[in-house]
Amino acid sequence: NDDNGYDISDYQNIMDEFGTMKDFDELLRECHKRNIKIMMDLVVNHTSDEHSWFMESKKSKDNEYRDYYVWKEGTNGQPPNNWGSVFSGPAWQYDEETQMYYLHLFSKKQPDLNWENPKLRNEIYSMMKWWLDKGVDGFRMDVINFISKDQNFPNGENGDFGPYAMNGPRIHEFLKEMKQMVLKEKDLITVGEMPGVTVEQGNLYTGKDRDELNMVFQFEHMDIGNGEFGKWHKNSFKLTELKRIMTKWQKGLENNGWNSLYWNNHDQPRVVSRFGDDKKYWNKSAKMLATCLHMMQGTPYIYQGEEIGMTNVAFEKLSDYKDIEILNAYEDLVVKKGRSHEEMMQGIYDRGRDNARTPMQWNDSENGGFTLGTPWIKVNPNYKSINVEEEINNEDSILNYYKRSEEHTSELQS
């Protein structure tokens, strides 16, 4: 478990920490009884290095699973190119056994799959059909615009793989094939997580006549304010810039594609801390952001805790943070490049992914009512005042405002 479950070792099983397949089947059954649909996270740009495919792939150069992954010869004792990983450091890992490098755009324990291989693609499609046969209602496709790479693997400017591994040359071919092989004529929802996607590309992915996806998660509004050290460097931005981005996507996909609307997810800081005010105007700014989200055209996505106004957390010790992105960025920027500890910690407080990953705050009992045991990461200390129980019977609460917003959105769309 190197990246909180995004390093998958078995596509047809449930991660131990979350229970068993029997538990999942019961969850699906009970949700469907209540007219709640379940969308699965589909992570098929990469697997875990503990997946049986990769274990076989690294055994020898002529193994039948070798071409399930991206293996390349080095250049003069160096990696095949200068691409950097999303999680800091090089995107290539040397394998002593076969004396070649494998590509990992994320952690070295997350080797990239080789979508150029039709046999690999068919394995993916079979797995997707298996989940649909179980009755799941759709897929959120993790970094799905990374699956097609420029097969020349050229160097990127300052190690940036984006122009060569995002929205690549065969991406539309692969998604159309997936639609035909798996998704066609089924009542499903499909949303692609797509860092770096433009409005023009968004229309190609979600257009009515395109036969690819229902909608995409774009990141443009999430990347606003990035500075010299990316998101770890707090930079001021104008409200008009945020409005410009949101308007661009609203107008750009109108009458053709479809927007997914979100402020929060497991990779982003808490919206009331990021774009609102988590102190004096906590209640009002959280409601303002909810109004903005629900009054745009598209499908709103609400992340756990957003509906009660959960805020960012500021743990004093680096050791209290669990996210591989945070820990690797600290190693790269502070230990190797000399950025100050204080500056980096402020960046973590502002934009770190663990802000979104502290346990849900149900009530004011120990650990926010999340568990009687020891939570995997500390609870935000403000759970005493910000929790579901505190808000559920308060008509003026953020929670009840979200409920009313959802009802209003449903009425408008019916």
Identify the meaning behind each predicted range.
Residues 1-410, 414:
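Active-site and adjacent substrate-binding regions of carbohydrate-active enzymes
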